Structures are given as C-alpha cells and as structure tokens.
Amino acid sequence: MKLSQCTSMNQIIEYYISNQITDTGRSSTNKQSVFYVKDIDKTHTANCIDTAIASMCTLLDKGIESGIIVFTMNISSTKSQTHYIPYSKENGSYILFNYINPTLYHTITTKRLNDGVDEQLTWLVENYERDFNCHVKQTKVYIPSKDICNCLYQFHKENKRISQIDIMTMCQR
C-alpha cells in the first residue's frame, strides 16, 4: 500500500511502521523505532497504561528519544486490541503522549473493564507529570515524518477528525 492510499489513521500508522521498521524491531534508516510491550491480560487494564509509561521512561533513560510503543490488550480469548503510542523527548524533559486510535482509548475509559480504570488513569497522568518532570498531552500526535504529516493533513481536510492546529504543529517540526 502507498501512503496516498491510506484512508484511516490506523492505516497511516501501519504504513509508518511497516516502512520504518526492520525484522529486528529497530529502524535501519533512522532512529524512529517500534518497541513491542508484552500482551496484557484483560483483568489488568490499568496496568497497560502503567506499562506504557514505564516503557517510555526506560527507553528515554537509554537515550532512545523517540519512537512508537505498541502493545496489545486481550479482551477475551478470541479478541484483542492493539494500541500505538508515539513518544518523543521534547525540550529536554517533555513527552508527547497520545493514543492514535481514540476509539480504543474511549473503550478503556468508559466500559470500565477493570474497576477504577478512570481514577487510575487520572492518577497515572498526575503522578507521571510530577514524578518524571514530563507533561502528558492527549491532544497531539507525534509522528516526525514530513510525508506522514502531509498525509495526516489531507486526512484532516477530508474527515475533520484531528485538529488542524495539531497537524500544523507536527509539520513544522
């Protein structure tokens, strides 16, 4: 599939991953990488957020300043959800944090697959900002590729599902 043929955010991300990442899980062309996090059982919904945050901080500590974390959450024995979390070190200490597919994020926070998920998410965001000197943003997508940015801009013009300001911010990086 060509980038111009992508018709959804998920397809754009899949294109980005498939064209940037080698079989070893690290990009051979630049430092953008995908890191796979273990499958997480449906009874530990809040822990998947915790795991993603911990993974980002661990990777930053190792000097890997940007990438996409991918993890799957098992909903049942036959169904799972995959989440893509792009992250980047910004201004020395900031991470841009976003669930690319807002529908999946909405599922976690509203269906309450685990008691207290909403409160746990709030706690993690608050403590993450304070303890790690990072600012969690759920309104921006960080994908540092000009082609991807242009494609997202086209997608916005056709679907109006992502903020134009956010896209302009991305494309100016």
What are these language model-derived features?
Residues 1-173:
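A structural boundary/capping signal
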